[in-house]
Curated annotation (Swiss-Prot):
F-type ATPases have 2 components, CF(1) - the catalytic core - and CF(0) - the membrane proton channel. CF(1) has five subunits: alpha(3), beta(3), gamma(1), delta(1), epsilon(1). CF(0) has three main subunits: a(1), b(2) and c(9-12). The alpha and beta chains form an alternating ring which encloses part of the gamma chain. CF(1) is attached to CF(0) by a central stalk formed by the gamma and epsilon chains, while a peripheral stalk is formed by the delta and b chains. It is found in: Cell inner membrane. This is ATP synthase subunit alpha. The record marks 373 as: Required for activity. Its EC number is 7.1.2.2. It is a peripheral membrane protein. It holds the Pfam family ATP-synt_ab. InterPro entries: ATP_synth_asu-like_sf, ATP_synth_asu_C, ATP_synth_asu_C_sf, ATP_synth_F1_a_nt-bd_dom, ATP_synth_F1_asu, ATPase_a/bsu_AS, ATPase_F1/V1/A1_a/bsu_N, ATPase_F1/V1/A1_a/bsu_N_sf. It comes from Shewanella sediminis (strain HAW-EB3).
Length: 513
């Protein structure tokens, strides 16, 4: 039998039309390599970036590298029992953590599991750890203050609700102490707090939790922990988990504060993961997307408008704005703020509080350098009375540091210069503050008023601290009504100024210094 070309062509067309394409998505793969917490999987055709992959023994990994013939994933926890040939499955979901009021007062790990021995957590649902930050239209400008309780910060570097304010400095100079005191100061303010500890010793974290409990702030705080001994993947993801827990309050029209302690260690953990995944290294061996690592996290801190809250809660909450304020911490090496990660985070945040080793060693606690510390948006949120009284404080300190350096070379100083130096010395001494002793708005106002109006001129430098303590004790006992008014309203007018002046005049007359 012979077929001509036309018949052959028709037959081929007919077969093509009848052919059915049968495709089967594969969601099961095989581990082909295990090393240093990284697994390489073959056979996963249906997997997305950041997806949770189910491993044997009820464990999970996260897919980070999607390559032509394999998937690189990082294991969330111990990996010693995993071996080549083990079967794994895709789950179709990304990592989620529990959120809600039930987490307040608890210590949890990166996955939101309790590690404080207080039993299971009653949560209000789950939230993905990776969430797109609110857009420009959904945001509201920062105009409400977050009081840290530190005179040096609240007067010169004010922080607003929804702001990102970096705390930067060398190791062991009070970065965590400043952040913890800020959390302690929120116990009666209604601001919910989240403290994220990344890459720290378990004993250090236990001490922080104990201090928060002692000062009555733990009931208002969620502590998220990824210790130095835990997998790099958990250290890398801990800030995102804590952020999702803080966003729960923001999206329901409440105010929240989150401390990331610290993002340097998170960047190191991410660098470790990236190098093990054989991603190309860049400056200081960090991967190319280390800026995005921090920017997508810190952009989630914001103040959102009432429409956003109403839309998110489906009309349950109306007319209320919400905020998430971030205090990221960065550790520098020998004061080098021009290193890769510090410059990245400085450019992302709305200002920085720079702590200096020399100031710390000279006895100034908190060791804030007012010259290079700045708050780019907090000024609009500053309490009126603090804003009015602190105007000359920053100038006095800046002039003092400049003149102090100059006076070392000058043998003879005129009276005006000497007066400026003496005033600067007294203001510097007044800015000293003990740890775990945050001050109220009224207490800060009285101290700043005394400095601004010249009440410290006749006080010996060594007695400034005692003078301040006695003055505040006098004001809170003899003029409690005035102090309550200042705390409640935060306003400053001629009446309040007159009362403060009369009170301080009376104190100076009755006391000998």
């Amino acid at each position: 039998m012979q077929l001509n070309s036309t018949e052959i062509s028709d037959l081929i067309k007919q077969r093509i039309e009848q052919f059915e394409v049968v495709s089967e998505t594969r969601n099961e793969g095989t581990i082909v390599a295990v090393s240093d917490g990284i697994i390489r999987i073959h056979g996963l055709a249906d997997v997305m970036q950041g997806e949770m992959i189910e491993l044997p023994g009820n464990r999970f990994a996260i897919a980070l590298n999607l390559e032509r013939d394999s998937v690189g994933a990082v294991v969330m926890g111990p990996y010693a029992s995993l071996a080549e040939g083990d079967k794994v499955k895709t789950t179709g979901r990304i990592l989620e953590v529990p959120v809600g009021n039930g987490l307040l007062g608890r210590v949890v790990n990166t996955l939101g599991e309790p590690i404080d021995g207080k039993g299971p957590i009653e949560h209000d649902g789950f939230s993905p750890v990776e969430v797109i930050a609110p857009g420009v239209i959904e945001r509201k400008s920062v105009d409400q203050p977050v009081q840290t309780g530190y005179k040096a910060v609240d007067s010169m570097i004010p922080i607003g609700r929804g702001q990102r304010e970096l705390i930067i400095g060398d190791r062991q100079i009070g970065k965590t102490a400043l952040a913890i005191d800020a959390i302690i100061n929120q116990k009666d303010s209604g601001i919910k707090c989240v403290y994220v500890a990344v890459g720290q010793k378990a004993s250090t974290i236990a001490n922080v939790v104990r201090k928060l409990d002692e000062h009555g702030a733990l009931a208002n705080t969620i502590v998220v922990v990824a210790t130095a001994s835990e997998a790099a993947a958990l250290q890398y993801l801990a800030p995102y988990s804590g952020c999702s827990m803080g966003e729960y309050f923001r999206d329901r029209g409440e105010d929240s504060l989150i401390v990331y302690d610290d993002l340097s260690k998170q960047a190191v953990a991410y660098r470790q993961i990236s190098l093990l995944l054989k991603r190309p290294p860049g400056r200081e061996a960090y991967p190319g997307d280390v800026f995005y690592l921090h920017s997508r996290l810190l952009e989630r801190a914001s103040r959102v408008n009432a429409e956003y809250v109403e839309k998110f809660t489906k009309g349950e909450v109306k007319g209320r704005t919400g905020s998430l304020t971030a205090l990221p911490i960065i550790e520098t090496q020998a004061g080098d703020v021009s290193a890769f990660v510090p410059t990245n985070v400085i450019s992302i945040t709305d200002g920085q509080i720079f702590l200096e080793t020399d100031l710390f060693n000279s006895g100034l606690r908190p060791a804030v350098n007012p010259g290079i510390s700045v708050s780019r948006v907090g000024g609009a949120a500053q309490t009126k009375i603090i804003k009015k009284l602190s105007g000359g404080i920053r100038t006095a300190l800046a002039q003092y540091r400049e003149l102090a350096a100059f006076s070392q070379f000058a043998s003879d100083l005129d009276d005006a210069t000497r007066a400026q130096l003496e005033h600067g010395e007294r203001v510097t001494e007044l800015m000293k503050q003990k740890q775990y002793a945050p001050m109220s708005i009224a207490d800060q106002s009285v101290s700043l008023f005394a400095a601004e109006k010249g009440y410290l001129k006749s006080i010996e430098l060594a007695k400034i601290g005692d003078f301040e303590a006695s003055l505040l004790s006098f004001m809170n006992s003899e003029h409690a009504e005035l102090m309550k008014t200042i705390n409640d309203t935060g306003s400053y007018n001629a009446d309040i100024e007159g009362e403060l002046k009369a009170s301080l005049d009376k104190f100076v007359e009755t006391q000998t210094w």
